[in-house]
Amino acid sequence: MKPADWLILQKKVRFGDCDSAGVIHFHNLLKWSHEAWEESIEIYGIPSQDIFPDFSIRKSQIIFPIVNCEANFLAPIKIGDLLKVKIVPHKINTHLFQVNSFFIKNGNKVAEGKIIHCSLDIDSRDKIELPDQLERWIEASNVSTNLKEC
């Protein structure tokens, strides 16, 4: 599997995504950013229940609350637009990681989202190291970037 398989996704803008001005409602960009990295880890091969807690089975003992996020709009995004969503994750330290999402329309970047998550123990809420499978996803996602830098 090539990184492009799990790092470049598609999103079609629907009527319900937009406000009365006919452009996406601002909160949808962060929603799409989060959904994109969720989809990315699933395509990579990490089951979502291994990352996100399911309190009915308590399989995951780790939670990843968002500690910082931002959205930047560079051009209007309208109903019917087909966007490429490029995911760029990176590890900040042992318990923090960031996922940048770049939204591209017709070859031009039209928006970007940034979400920073903190890895916490589900019971104590203490900071803990990122799980191995998440670290592997981040590392694999950055292999092509690291090769270009060499």
UniProtKB/Swiss-Prot annotation:
<dbReference type="InterPro" id="IPR029069">
    <property type="entry name" value="HotDog_dom_sf"/>
</dbReference>
<dbReference type="GO" id="GO:0061522">
    <property type="term" value="F:1,4-dihydroxy-2-naphthoyl-CoA thioesterase activity"/>
</dbReference>
<dbReference type="Pfam" id="PF13279">
    <property type="entry name" value="4HBT_2"/>
</dbReference>
<comment type="similarity">
    <text>Belongs to the 4-hydroxybenzoyl-CoA thioesterase family. DHNA-CoA hydrolase subfamily.</text>
</comment>
<dbReference type="InterPro" id="IPR022829">
    <property type="entry name" value="DHNA_CoA_hydrolase"/>
</dbReference>
<comment type="pathway">
    <text>Cofactor biosynthesis; phylloquinone biosynthesis.</text>
</comment>
<feature type="active site">
    <location>
        <position position="19"/>
    </location>
</feature>
<protein>
    <recommendedName>
        <fullName>1,4-dihydroxy-2-naphthoyl-CoA hydrolase</fullName>
        <ecNumber>3.1.2.28</ecNumber>
    </recommendedName>
</protein>
<comment type="function">
    <text>Catalyzes the hydrolysis of 1,4-dihydroxy-2-naphthoyl-CoA (DHNA-CoA) to 1,4-dihydroxy-2-naphthoate (DHNA), a reaction involved in phylloquinone (vitamin K1) biosynthesis.</text>
</comment>
<dbReference type="GO" id="GO:0042372">
    <property type="term" value="P:phylloquinone biosynthetic process"/>
</dbReference>
<keyword id="KW-0378">Hydrolase</keyword>
<comment type="pathway">
    <text>Quinol/quinone metabolism; 1,4-dihydroxy-2-naphthoate biosynthesis; 1,4-dihydroxy-2-naphthoate from chorismate: step 7/7.</text>
</comment>
